[in-house]
């Protein structure tokens, strides 16, 4: 009998958002039969201690992630996770495979967005997709996935130095906001009937809000909620990556 897939999640410090994300991952793992182990370390954990833990988990677990954010001094340890164990898809080797169109671990949020588009009846083939935000976690890998053969979207990747952002967004059949700035995208920036994917999760005095303003609902044909939209899909794809090991 094959053993159940195993996933180790390493948390550094006590960030409330991290704790919430890990709880969601643990709940989903339990439902699908993945054995999840949570390793909780203090914020002042020395680099060597984290390196030793990662080295040990690389040998004993199927999947391994370090929950972000972590202190900048510890960020180089992310590259210590073996690419084959890197179910988050953050390792530079896995990102390199994505650039070349070689099979490998795909970052969970971009993979979840692609799955969400297909399952909601929004095949991106031939569509103009505008991605706002070029992080290596979401924006850049998503733009690569969308432009791959078989997906075949036409992609515009916007960032903090993009001129006339309003005009670029207005041309999108599908608009993805992944900036981390509350209510940055307004209805004046959206083409009537566009599909909106809101990746942002921002804590404000009014609670959690996305990168997309509520008034966009007046013009968009479909829009993902925050919370409860892209986030759950990210968790699902993490479990999928773990099961592929």
Question: What are the residue ranges of the model-derived segments?
Answer:
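Glycine-rich phosphate/diphosphate-binding loop of Rossmann-like nucleotide-binding domains
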Residues: 14-26, 72, 104-195, 204, ...
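Positively charged, low-complexity intrinsically disordered leader regions
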Residues: 1-3, 10
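Glycine/small-residue-rich loop that forms an oxyanion/phosphate-binding "nest" at active or ligand-binding sites
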Residues: 68-111
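Periplasmic-binding protein-like
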Residues: 61-69
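Short, well-structured alpha-helical segments in soluble
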Residues: 49-60
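Residues that mark the start of a beta-strand
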Residues: 4-6, 127-128
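Short beta-strand elements in bilobed, periplasmic/extracellular small-molecule ligand-binding domains
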Residues: 29-43, 155-157
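Rossmann-fold NAD(P)-binding glycine/threonine-rich loop
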Residues: 77-95, 192, 197-245
């Amino acid at each position: 009998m094959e053993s159940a897939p195993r996933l180790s999640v390493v948390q550094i410090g006590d960030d409330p958002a991290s704790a919430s994300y890990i709880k969601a991952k643990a709940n989903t793992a339990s439902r699908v039969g993945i054995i999840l182990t949570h390793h909780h370390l203090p914020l002042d954990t020395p680099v060597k201690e984290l390196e030793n833990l990662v080295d040990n988990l690389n040998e004993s677990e199927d999947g391994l992630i370090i929950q972000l954010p972590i202190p900048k001094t510890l960020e180089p340890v992310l590259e210590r996770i073996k690419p084959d164990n890197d179910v988050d898809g953050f390792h530079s080797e896995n990102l390199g495979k994505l650039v070349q169109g070689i099979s490998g671990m795909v970052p969970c949020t971009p993979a979840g967005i692609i799955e969400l588009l297909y399952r909601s009846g929004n095949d991106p083939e031939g569509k103009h997709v505008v991605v706002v935000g070029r992080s290596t976690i979401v924006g850049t890998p998503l733009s690569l996935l969308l432009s791959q053969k078989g997906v075949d979207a036409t992609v515009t990747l916007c960032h903090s130095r993009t001129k006339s952002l309003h005009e670029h967004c207005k041309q999108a059949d599908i608009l993805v906001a992944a900036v981390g700035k509350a209510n940055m995208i307004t209805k004046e920036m959206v083409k009537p009937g566009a599909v909106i994917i809101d990746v942002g999760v921002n804590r404000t005095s009014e609670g959690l809000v996305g990168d997309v303003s509520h008034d966009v609902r007046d013009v968009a044909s479909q829009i993902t909620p925050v919370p409860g939209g892209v986030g759950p899909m990210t968790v699902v794809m993490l479990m999928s990556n773990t099961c592929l090991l």
